[in-house]
């Protein structure tokens, strides 16, 4: 397949994003292929983002702001060529609306896995929830997108085996984490900005 970037008139920023999103997982996986072969594990690249900018109301389940809708469309452009076959969201409309442009573009139905809190500590995520999302994202190898929340994305990176566990504040919406899982519980993490 020949790609003519000049005829498509991609601007320099879009071209750089395309190169990073498409080539970074290959670079990260290159050093991990041997470990994956030894463990009979399919290398998986998982893209994690926090939902896009949300409205203030209704507080329980707000929709996206116009800026959030634009960010969701930009995410679809950025990850449109990343060969994503699995998309996972929470039950909240802000995550579904963030994933929707990419899901529509790829013809992929997003899987909704409701966020569950620990029965032991209401401030912690349920270990079963984290395991279910990580297992679903890595089930078939390939590439996956998880759209989460400021409190779920760091914990999901950890559940996937990542050693970089960022803190995401409530005003930050432009983080894109690329987690290359090369063995059960072992991964490399790259932190990009959308």
Regions picked out by a protein language model, each given a short descriptive name:
Residues 10-21:
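N-terminal export leaders
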Residues 19-29:
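Bacterial N-terminal signal peptides
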Residues 40-141, 153-155, 159-194:
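Active-site-proximal alpha-helix that buttresses catalytic centers in soluble enzyme cores
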Residues 2-7:
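Secretory targeting signals
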Residues 143-147:
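Periplasmic-binding protein-like
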Residues 32-36:
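Sec/Tat signal peptide C-region and signal peptidase I cleavage site
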């Amino acid at each position: 397949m020949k790609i003519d970037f000049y005829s498509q008139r991609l601007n320099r920023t879009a071209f750089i994003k395309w190169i990073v999103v498409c080539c970074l997982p290959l670079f990260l996986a290159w050093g991990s292929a041997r470990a994956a072969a030894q463990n009979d594990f399919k290398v998986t690249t998982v893209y994690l983002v926090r939902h896009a900018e949300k409205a203030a109301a209704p507080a329980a389940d707000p929709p996206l702001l116009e800026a959030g809708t634009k960010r969701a469309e930009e995410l679809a452009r950025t990850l449109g060529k990343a060969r994503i076959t699995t998309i996972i969201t929470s039950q909240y409309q802000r995550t579904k609306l963030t994933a929707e442009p990419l899901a529509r573009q790829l013809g992929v139905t997003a899987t909704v896995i409701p966020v569950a809190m620990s029965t032991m500590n209401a401030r912690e995520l349920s270990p079963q929830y984290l395991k279910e999302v990580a297992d679903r994202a890595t089930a078939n190898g390939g590439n996956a997108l998880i759209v989460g929340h400021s409190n779920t994305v760091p914990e999901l990176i950890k559940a996937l085996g990542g050693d970089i566990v960022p803190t995401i504040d409530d005003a930050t919406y432009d983080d894109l984490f690329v987690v290359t899982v090369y063995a059960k519980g072992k991964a490399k993490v790259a932190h990009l900005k959308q």
